Regions:
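Von Willebrand factor
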Residues: 353-414
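Ligand-binding pocket segment of bilobal, Venus flytrap-like solute-binding proteins
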Residues: 183-255
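Extended ligand-binding regions for polar small-molecule ligands
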Residues: 128-140, 264-299
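Ligand-binding cleft/hinge of the Venus flytrap
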Residues: 61-65, 143-216
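Periplasmic-binding protein-like
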Residues: 116-124, 150, 163, 197-203, 245-273, 278, 287-308
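N-terminal segment of the mature folded domain
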Residues: 36-164
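Acidic, polar low-complexity linker/tail segments
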Residues: 7, 30-32, 306-359, 366-374
Length: 414
């Protein structure tokens, strides 16, 4: 086991979790569109929102109540939101992390009047003493400078999964673009470049821990012993507030000079041919974009100014000691087409990420007889079928190790 420690991240997946997730995925694709699950009522205005918007919920619900809008907000990760909408769950508006995901919705979903509500860079946050050691303080840092620090085993970082979260995907696409030399348009041919793949693989050798959600990443970082994290600027601001309240060293934010991934937090209407809902959406969107609504977003560490710059930004939020300079223009990464995004994420899943060792413990006890056993079989057929699993970027790579342990009262086959 020690010999394989550097090559494998060992994950134990308990089968009831597998069933809950994968059977739900299967059920979604088979049944949801037919039965109209979660169809919105005539009165309730339903928003499906990325989890990072929870900190603005109280303000938005207060406005809705004062303006006779019966508002319901459901939260999920951005990529999960796309799955929910594509699988037929009905909402009146979507408030996701990044506009790139709206282009991945099915053609039958009519999304209108999408407007960016804030700007949130996805950046490196490094312990200030470590950033000083690396020579990153008060210096223009490029992605290859970070890569070199990782190559020399001087830097380890944590981040969310590129295939399951917006922050992970956005950061990854930023790495791809900058290491490819920032082409005017990133193409599928660019993704096949062996040197690019080599550098991306080297960069991800520095990933000490990965998380399936941004919320867990923040919690994991605060409770662990990590020297760097890749996440939203807003998240690092929140992490630093907590670190300083505990008397701990804050993180120093690095904005790569050659390009930073930006999340634009679009708020968009899902047209269900309901004039009353369209009017309610318009009022909610106008409030979010009003001076009052934007001021509430700024309090949480979001940038709402043109180009993300404002020399008069609140220094208690955008603290210069943390490497934040709101007077400087952030160079945004150019996102590629939807097809190239899908291709690049597939390459990460099958070629670039660290190999994993997944252990499936399959329950064949009497309580699983009948429907339970059928669900178990369907779940395993789904996750082990590369073509099916790849639809949700859950496929294994040839480097992964899979162990299956069937059991009832005892482990079977021993």
């Amino acid at each position: 086991m020690k010999k394989k420690k550097s090559n494998y991240i060992i994950a134990l997946i308990i089968i009831y979790l597998v069933l809950v997730y994968f059977f739900n995925v299967i059920s979604d694709h088979v049944n949801i569109k037919n039965i109209g699950i979660n169809k919105t009522s005539d009165k309730t205005f339903k928003i499906i929102s990325s989890t990072e918007n929870k900190d603005i919920e109280e303000t938005l619900k207060k406005y809705a109540k004062e303006n006779q809008i019966d508002l319901q907000i459901d939260y999920a990760g951005t990529i999960e939101i796309m799955d929910k909408l594509n699988n037929g769950e009905n909402y009146d508006a979507v408030w996701c992390s990044n506009s790139i995901w709206l282009y991945m919705l099915n053609d039958g979903i009519s999304v209108k009047n999408s407007k960016s509500t804030s700007i949130n860079p996805v950046v490196f946050g490094i312990e200030k003493s470590k950033a000083q050691e690396l020579g990153f303080i008060d210096k223009e840092v490029y992605t290859k400078d970070i890569l070199n620090a990782i190559r020399e085993n001087k830097l380890k970082f944590s981040m969310s999964s590129p295939t399951q979260t917006n922050t992970g995907a956005s950061a990854y696409l930023g790495f791809v673009s900058t290491l490819a030399g920032n082409p005017e348009v990133l193409t599928e041919k660019d993704l096949e470049n062996d040197q690019l793949k080599k550098e991306l693989t080297q960069l991800y050798t520095g990933m000490a821990r990965s998380s399936g959600s941004d919320e867990f990443l923040e919690e994991m970082f605060l409770n662990g012993n990590y020297e760097a994290v890749v996440t939203y600027e807003t998240s690092i601001i929140n992490i630093n507030k907590q670190l300083e309240s505990q008397g701990k060293e804050p993180l120093y934010i690095i904005y790569a000079k050659d390009g930073v991934s930006i999340s634009d937090s679009p708020f968009a209407y899902i047209d269900n041919k309901n004039e009353e809902k369209a009017d309610e959406f318009s009022r909610l969107q106008k409030y979010i974009l009003s001076n009052e609504g934007q001021a509430e977003l700024v309090k949480t560490g979001r940038r709402v100014w043109y180009g993300g710059t404002n020399e008069n930004a609140d220094k208690t939020v955008f603290n210069p000691d943390w490497g934040i300079d709101t007077s400087k223009y952030i160079v945004p990464v150019k996102y590629p087409s939807t097809e190239v995004i899908k291709k690049s994420l597939g390459i990460y899943q099958t070629e670039l990420r660290k190999p994993i060792h997944t252990v499936f413990c399959l329950d064949y006890s009497g309580s699983m007889y009948g429907e339970g056993n059928n669900q178990l079989t369907e779940a395993m057929e789904y996750i082990l079928n590369e073509e099916e699993a790849s639809k949700n970027l859950l496929q294994f790579s040839s480097k992964d190790k899979i162990t299956i342990i069937p059991f009832n009262t005892n482990i079977l086959g021993t």
